[in-house]
Design a protein with these regions (language model features):
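N-terminal catalytic or cofactor-binding beta/alpha core of small enzyme domains
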Residues: 1-119, 123, 128-139, 144-168
């Protein structure tokens, strides 16, 4: 199992994934779950994704598009249809979890279950502290991700009650 926590810890709420990674490291013994902290997703990550059964991408989302409510938690499965060749862009400076999963499938034949866990941030200004609303929501967000990890580790577990929707 791989957890990819990405964002910029020097841009306020954009660094929330790194805080999640810190919390999850205390909940899972070393070796049980691999946790990476990255500033952004890169094509090289596809190799690591190809070597696991499941990956969870953790990030701050922006409400700027109007599609998100402030401080909204979403945990979504990235569907298998997303892993086709059309998902891979020529431009690698702005990769999404879908593209990394698609690259893993295309280059390595990987079929890891993939999930996106996001929390809508409020401020992305320079700074290393989280907004009050995000600090308040963080424990619930961590609990949701921890529950997903535990269900994925249990062969008889069902993640359907833990995810908001399948993204196809």
């Amino acid at each position: 199992m791989l957890i990819v926590a990405y964002g910029n810890p020097l841009r306020s709420d954009d660094g929330l994934a790194w805080r999640v990674a810190d919390a999850l490291e205390t909940k899972f013994p070393s070796g049980e779950v691999e946790i990476l902290r990255l500033h952004q997703l890169t094509p090289e990550l596809a190799e690591g994704v190809s070597q696991v059964d499941a990956v969870i991408f953790v990030d701050a989302a922006s409400a700027d598009t109007g599609e998100r409510r402030p401080v909204e938690i979403r945990v979504e499965e990235i569907g298998s249809k997303d892993a086709g060749p059309s998902a891979v862009s020529r431009f690698s400076h702005h990769l999404t979890p879908r593209v990394v999963v698609a690259l893993a499938a295309q280059l390595y034949g990987a079929r890891a279950r993939a999930f996106s866990a996001t929390l809508t941030g409020q401020t992305f200004d320079h700074g290393d502290s989280l907004s009050a609303a995000i600090r308040h929501a963080l424990p619930e967000f961590i609990t949701r991700i921890e529950g997903l990890v535990r269900e994925l580790q249990n062969p008889a577990g069902s993640v359907s009650r833990l995810i908001d929707q399948a993204v196809e």
